[in-house]
Curated annotation (Swiss-Prot):
Family: Belongs to the bacterial ribosomal protein bL20 family.
Protein role: Binds directly to 23S ribosomal RNA and is necessary for the in vitro assembly process of the 50S ribosomal subunit. It is not involved in the protein synthesizing functions of that subunit.
Species for this entry: Aethionema grandiflorum (Persian stone-cress)
Keyword field: Chloroplast, Plastid, Ribonucleoprotein, Ribosomal protein, RNA-binding, rRNA-binding
The protein, known as: Large ribosomal subunit protein bL20c
Gene from which this protein is expressed: rpl20
InterPro entries found in the cross-reference section: Ribosomal_bL20 (IPR005813), Ribosomal_protein_bL20_C (IPR035566)
GO cellular component: chloroplast; ribonucleoprotein complex; ribosome
Compartment(s) of residence: Plastid, Chloroplast
Length: 117
């Protein structure tokens, strides 16, 4: 039986990793061992930060809504505003409310006046 050297398979795997790590700095883009380690680390960071990005955007939306609500002086706080939204069954999420707060404050004023009634 002939000996199989699996050179092509290993080279194909390394080139795939090398393409991924080509933008890394220093030895992380040149040496195979450090390339594989940095690839794993990059994928872990990407997975972790996808969840973090969702949290950060939610915090940003809440901050924007709260800032406009503090100016309106109709509601004392953000949580009362959201509570009254749910009570009146107004189905607007925080992302849409933040966009309305930035782009069209008068519309947010009318929404808050409808909630109070």
């Amino acid at each position: 039986m002939t000996r199989i050297k699996r050179g092509y398979i290993a080279r194909r795997r390394r080139t795939k990793i090398r393409l991924f790590a080509s933008s890394f700095r220093g030895a992380h883009s040149r040496l195979t061992r450090t390339m594989t380690q940095q690839r794993i680390r990059a994928l872990v960071s990407a997975h972790r930060d996808r969840g973090r990005r969702k949290r950060d955007f939610r915090r940003l939306w809440i901050t924007r809504i709260n800032a406009v609500i503090q100016e309106m002086e109709v509601f004392n706080s953000y949580n009362r505003f959201i509570h009254n939204l749910y009570k009146k069954q107004v189905l607007l999420n925080r992302k849409i409310l933040a966009q309305i707060a930035l782009l069209n404050r008068s519309c947010l004023y009318t929404i808050s006046n409808e909630i109070i009634k």
